[in-house]
């Protein structure tokens, strides 16, 4: 809320990336967001087969209140003097993206990819519900696992303020993508991942398949140690994206990997 007030005082729009939460878990516009973005490749598509994104303009932000957005306020020559902020309100930002950015970049999604995303939306609530249900059980399993130092998931936060925020904003659950820290270092983390069989070793997330990765040596390998720690990534950090498989199978796979690590 303090950040939101700061943003309001600065007269800049509040943009929220809601990819991991999805509209099923939280709707940022209802809490004051001006623009919401999604990587549709993740939960919306659901199967890691299609690349695309979504930008949602709430229509609540006044782009004419200062001189920070001349490209939206000033007359556009290519559209015969149209001012997107004045003539296309309240959907000024969305209209600008369609009329200018898509025209200039050619980033138009193909019909078949659009079809795949629309199909994904039909089962979004069912899939995310299962993702979250499985994730909560996996979190509890990892929390009680002696070879785990820490599990980073909002459902088990010991911070009272975080608990209250979690209950307020995530009544349907805190998502299925999280990290945990295994006892040891990078060597132990990589050995654990190498012994997973049901989990796929992929950098993607939010797939119906359960995914695991070692961020320090993959997605964030270009960062130095200080930069990694600044982002909450340690050598023993493992990221999981819990899928929709039978949760007993998921936990059994994790259990077998821990047994291999203990040998």
Give a label for each model feature.
Residues 2-7:
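Short, small-residue-biased leader/transition segments that mark boundaries at the very start
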Residues 8-12, 123:
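Short, surface-exposed connector motifs at secondary-structure boundaries
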Residues 23, 187, 249:
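Residues that form or flank phosphate/diphosphate-binding pockets in enzymes
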Residues 35-38, 44-177, 181-210:
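Active-site C-terminal subdomain of aminotransferase-like
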Residues 1, 127, 194-195, 210-263:
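PLP-dependent enzyme catalytic core of the Aspartate aminotransferase-like
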Residues 1, 12-46:
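Conserved PLP phosphate-binding loop immediately N-terminal to the Schiff-base lysine helix
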Residues 19-21, 156, 183, 243-245:
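Active-site beta-loop-alpha junctions enriched in small/polar residues
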Residues 14-17, 28, 53, 131, ...:
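Buried hydrophobic positions in well-ordered alpha/beta secondary-structure cores of metabolic enzymes
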């Amino acid at each position: 809320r303090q950040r939101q007030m700061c943003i309001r005082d600065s007269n800049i729009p509040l943009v929220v990336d809601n990819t991991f939460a999805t509209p099923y878990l939280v709707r940022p516009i209802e809490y004051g967001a001006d623009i919401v973005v999604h990587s549709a490749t993740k939960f919306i598509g659901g199967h890691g087969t299609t690349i695309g994104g979504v930008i949602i303009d709430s229509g609540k932000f006044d782009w004419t209140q200062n001189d920070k957005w001349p490209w939206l306020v000033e007359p556009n020559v290519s559209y015969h003097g149209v001012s997107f902020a004045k003539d296309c309100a309240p959907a000024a930002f969305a209209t600008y993206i369609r009329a200018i950015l898509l025209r200039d970049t050619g980033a138009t999604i193909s019909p078949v990819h659009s079809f795949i995303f629309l199909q994904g939306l039909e089962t979004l609530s069912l899939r995310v519900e299962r993702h979250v249900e499985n994730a909560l059980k996996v979190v509890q399993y990892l929390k009680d696992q002696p070879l785990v130092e820490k599990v980073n998931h909002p459902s088990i936060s010991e911070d009272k303020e975080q608990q209250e925020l979690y209950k307020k904003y995530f009544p349907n659950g805190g998502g299925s993508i999280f990290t945990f820290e295994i006892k040891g270092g990078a060597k132990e983390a990589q050995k654990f991942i190498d012994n997973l069989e049901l989990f796929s070793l992929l950098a993607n997330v939010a797939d119906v398949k359960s995914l695991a990765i070692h961020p320090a040596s993959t997605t964030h390998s270009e960062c130095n140690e200080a930069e990694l720690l600044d982002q909450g990534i340690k050598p023993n950090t493992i990221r999981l994206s819990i899928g929709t498989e039978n949760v007993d199978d998921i936990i059994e796979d994790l259990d077998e990997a821990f047994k291999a690590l203990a040998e």
